[in-house]
Amino acid sequence: MQKVVLATGNPGKVRELAQLLADFGLDIVAQTELGVDSAEETGLTFIENAILKARHAAQVTGLPAIADDSGLSVDILGGAPGIYSARYAGENATDQQNLEKLLDTMKDIPDDQRQAQFNCVLVYIRHAEDPTPLVFHGRWPGFIAHKSAGNGGFGYDPIFYIPELGCTAAELTGEQKNAVSHRGQALKMMLDTLRNA
């Protein structure tokens, strides 16, 4: 089994990606288990930040790395919270604080203007100097609900409503979510590419 470092300290992302990669023959190790500090996210896009994180983890560990940069983009807010999704309510904000700030920001926004999408950029980098990192983008459209529903997932999942499923992302099982989510889409693209490489 090939060891690959997962360049995140977010336990929700580690859990989702490890579950999705279990059958692929990759031994996924979270960077925190290897004593790797988080890279500074100085990019202006999900792609830039994912590459920064993957390159940093590969450089420190000497292992191939997978990095994820993802977030929620709300149309009426010009794409916010976007790359700042994890710290929308402040630098050390909890998921609940971020979610509550978004609900408060959108309290007067009518239903027909609550479109949003989760975006996930996954980067696979073979080594720290890799000049051609593999980049995959998944997008999951939905709407921002008026209140939380469900106990699954993490982050904004309890207020991310998927009309065709009639529920929020937090009301899906992990398996259901992985089949349709932005992260599941990006990972499927990555695995298809690695399989055929």
Curated annotation (Swiss-Prot):
Cofactors named for this entry: Mg(2+)
Alphabetic keyword roster: Hydrolase, Magnesium, Metal-binding, Nucleotide metabolism, Nucleotide-binding
Cofactor binding comment, as recorded: Binds 1 Mg(2+) ion per subunit.
Binding sites annotated in the UniProt record for Mg(2+): 40, 69
One cellular component (GO) term of this entry: cytosol
Biological process, per Gene Ontology: nucleotide metabolic process; purine nucleoside triphosphate catabolic process
Residues the entry annotates as binding substrate: 8-13, 70, 154-157, 177, 182-183
Active site: 69 (proton acceptor)
Class of enzymatic activity (EC top level): hydrolase
EC code: 3.6.1.66
GO molecular function: dITP diphosphatase activity; ITP diphosphatase activity; metal ion binding; nucleotide binding; ribonucleoside triphosphate phosphatase activity; XTP diphosphatase activity
Superkingdom of source: Bacteria
Reaction(s) this enzyme catalyzes, per UniProt: XTP + H2O = XMP + diphosphate + H(+); dITP + H2O = dIMP + diphosphate + H(+); ITP + H2O = IMP + diphosphate + H(+)
Entries under InterPro entries matching the protein: dITP/XTP_pyrophosphatase (IPR020922), ITPase-like_fam (IPR029001), RdgB/HAM1 (IPR002637)
Family the entry assigns: Belongs to the HAM1 NTPase family.
Its job: Pyrophosphatase that catalyzes the hydrolysis of nucleoside triphosphates to their monophosphate derivatives, with a high preference for the non-canonical purine nucleotides XTP (xanthosine triphosphate), dITP (deoxyinosine triphosphate) and ITP. Seems to function as a house-cleaning enzyme that removes non-canonical purine nucleotides from the nucleotide pool, thus preventing their incorporation into DNA/RNA and avoiding chromosomal lesions.
Subunit-structure text: Homodimer.
Name listed for the protein in its UniProt record: dITP/XTP pyrophosphatase
